[in-house]
Amino acid sequence: LSVRSRVAKAAGGAARFASRALGRGSGGMIGGEVAMRISPKFLSELAAPYSSVIVTGTNGKSTTTRMVRAALESAGPVASNINGDNMTSGVITALMQGRGATRAALEVDEMHVPAVAADVNPAVFVYLNLSRDQLDRVGEIGSVERRLRDGASAHPDAIIVANCDDPLIVSAAADNPNVVWVAAGAGWGGDSAAYPRGGRVVRSGEDWHLIPAFDGEALPELSARPKPQWWLEDVELAPEGPRATLRGPDGISVRLELKLPGRANLGNAAQAVAAAVAMGIDPAAAAAAVSSVTEVAGRYSVHDVN
């Protein structure tokens, strides 16, 4: 770090400590805010030693980030914004706390992806899903897709682990030469009836394809659901947690037996394992680590009440 950034790191750490000591919060944002004010280049310098994964999307960011972190921890310490502080200042604070870590699992708000990625230079992006959310803050869904598209296209060497069941995510990732397609589930599809690059989406079971929205409309080169490289089989929504076999490239087959509830979390787990494998983690170790996650910043936790 430069002298200015070392001062910024010390000041940010002090601000975080003061926030916690005074009961004003976890300090997950204020530490990064202070550091960034002192040294605008602080994040790029701080992130340089890390091999990072950026996780983004409308739903499932915190859960998937927690799963990615668990998988990466099978190979050593990991820096991560575990409390969901997912804007630039929260990412800074997470990396400041990553003592001994060379990898980072970072949840990033959709609208902050291009700016954070420009400084972090991630090895892997995880694009989960897109739907209308917080319209007063982020605007229409098309503008969010454009942000994610810009984030991916600015990093052609990065791997994009993208949900091929969501047409908006497919559009955001399609220009990158290193996409890993995961069949993670479509969820709500009403916001992807119109495709950002032209055409309308027609769904048939798990598949989807584009048709012209008007006579003579040209369709984009990628005009149908990409063939997934990772997919789930033998899905069982058991009372103790969802289970499935995750298939991947080169004959990979690993078992997911999640502690977290719901079909959606199987999709999150599939993308987390795919991201970890892209970072060099053994598939079986990644699946076991992801399956061991029991709570996410207090969510899904179980308490005995007398």
Predicted segments, located by residue:
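Extended acidic/charged loop-beta regions that coordinate divalent cations
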Residues: 106-133, 171-255, 297
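Gly/charged, well-structured mid-domain segments that form the phosphate/adenylate-handling core
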Residues: 239, 249, 261-263, 274-306
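A short helix->loop->beta-strand "cap" motif at the edges of active sites that frequently abuts
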Residues: 155-159, 176-178
